[in-house]
Regions:
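Phosphate-binding and adjacent anionic-ligand microenvironments
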Residues: 223, 263-409
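An N-terminal, well-structured beta->alpha segment
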Residues: 1-66, 141-166
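Active-site nucleophile and cofactor-binding loops and adjacent substrate-binding regions
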Residues: 70-78, 245-248, 295-296
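N-terminal small/polar loop signature for handling phosphorylated ligands or for N-terminal nucleophile
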Residues: 32, 41-104, 184-239
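Short glycine-rich phosphate-binding loop at a beta-alpha junction
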Residues: 39-47, 71, 167-170, 265-272, ...
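Gly/Ser/Thr-enriched, mixed-charge loops and adjacent short helices
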Residues: 3, 12, 105-221
Length: 409
């Protein structure tokens, strides 16, 4: 059974990978791993799902070798916990299913300021056979603490402005970024929606999952720009009035141009995934002399490549943007609004650039992939590009068709 994806694991609450029996075994194995690594304290963050309380209790029950466990006193965004983990050089567990609906949950893991790497994941899985052999539990201290302060200070010092001469709508997806509603300086004068979380409304017809549909609603149309987060705040989508959702490739170009030509940073490359629009590589090379590196889909893959090639920016087409080697939707929102305030012409210029390839995404049951792929190869021979990717968490294979022929349906 596959457990880890590229960013922890998730499942339906109390089903599959989130069944109590499996989780007891997993966190007991994690406990052995942490003991061998001489980890003495663990930090736990969580988003706004109703199931978080149950999972916190289960984790604490099984980490019998950890002396100090700190639990956030309120929901926490994943970027916030990552920043806290990096500052404290600790082991941290984020309880979240990101953009998935309320009946899902899952876990992301951070160790020494980085996402848990594959070698550590393999070590944890290899320890399953030792579970239940050591029942000794040390005297444990569990504290509820605030884990927000350092991150909020970092963000507010970086984006120290609040007066933007545009009408901005921010959708918090009833997720963990909701707790920052009145604490982020750069959002002070923005209109805000979907922040009254109740444990059962995270990502419910709101946030980044539904921005494409919601921007057609009357209450969205009156704003110049909309920003939508997902449930744990590591992604952000942007839309402009009368344009629609701004493609992540164009957002990346906006960021890169701002860094290079307005902030004077050295920008030689950028990292994205294999499903990025093929147009981007040629555009960056010809217009900005910037090299595009591609890697497998997944936050960890992007960040590892970003570190390796020393890139100022990494991004996924889903709306994840990495600046300080972490995917951070809040930072992305702050940067976008900073550019909107200081150089709105740059945004207008970039979003009006024509994209050579259009994109269609086809979802199929995984057992149909071979037949579909064979048919799509006929289209590829006409100068189009095809990428086939199997979903980690669903029995679905996605086929990405990048095409120039407007006749394709």
């Amino acid at each position: 059974m596959k457990i880890f994806g590229e960013d922890g694991f998730r499942d339906l609450f109390k089903k599959g990978l989130l069944e109590e029996k499996f989780l007891n075994k997993f966190f007991s194995a994690l406990d052995i791993f942490l003991k061998r690594q001489k980890v003495k304290k663990v930090f736990i963050g969580y988003d706004t799902r109703f199931s978080s309380k149950y999972l916190i209790h289960l984790i604490i029950k099984n980490l019998i070798s950890i002396k100090l466990i700190y639990v956030g006193n309120k929901p926490l965004s994943t970027p916030c916990l990552y920043y806290s983990s990096k500052q404290r050089k600790s082991f941290s567990i984020m309880i979240t299913a990101s953009h998935f609906q309320k009946n899902f949950n899952g876990f992301k893991f951070f160790y020494r300021g980085r996402k848990l790497d594959k070698n550590y994941e393999k070590k944890i899985l290899s320890l399953f056979k030792y579970v239940n052999k050591n029942k000794y539990k040390i005297k444990q201290i569990v504290k509820k603490v605030s884990l927000h302060e350092n991150y909020l200070r970092f963000i507010n010092e970086r984006f120290n402005f609040n007066n933007i001469n545009k009408k901005i709508l921010v959708d918090f997806a009833n997720g963990s970024t909701s707790v920052f509603k009145n604490k982020l300086n750069f959002l002070k004068n923005c209109n805000k929606i979907n922040y009254l979380y109740n444990g059962h409304n995270i990502n419910e017809k709101c946030g980044s999952n539904f921005l494409k549909k919601n921007i057609n609603k009357k209450n969205f149309k009156k704003f110049n720009y909309c920003i939508a987060f997902d449930g744990d705040g590591d992604r952000a989508l942007f839309s402009k009035q009368k344009y629609g959702i701004i493609e992540s490739e164009k957002i990346a170009i906006i960021f890169l141009n701002y860094f290079k030509y307005h902030k004077g940073h050295s920008v030689y490359n950028v990292v994205s995934t294999k499903i990025v629009n093929p147009w981007l590589k040629e555009y960056l090379k010809n217009e900005n002399n910037i090299r595009l590196y591609k890697t497998k889909v997944g936050d960890r893959n992007i960040i590892n490549k970003q570190i390796k090639v020393k890139s100022i920016l990494g991004f996924e087409t889903s709306g994840h943007y990495s600046f300080y080697y972490a995917m951070d939707g809040i930072y992305a929102a702050g940067l976008f609004l900073e550019i909107l305030k200081e150089n709105p012409e740059l945004i207008d210029k970039i979003i009006n650039i024509p994209i050579a390839y259009k994109l269609k995404i086809f979802n199929f049951s995984s057992n149909c992939t071979k037949d579909i792929k064979r048919k799509l190869k006929l289209i590829k021979n006409k100068g189009n590009k095809i990428i086939v990717r199997k979903s980690i968490w669903e029995d679905t294979t996605r086929i990405y068709l990048f095409y120039k022929n407007s006749q394709i349906k």
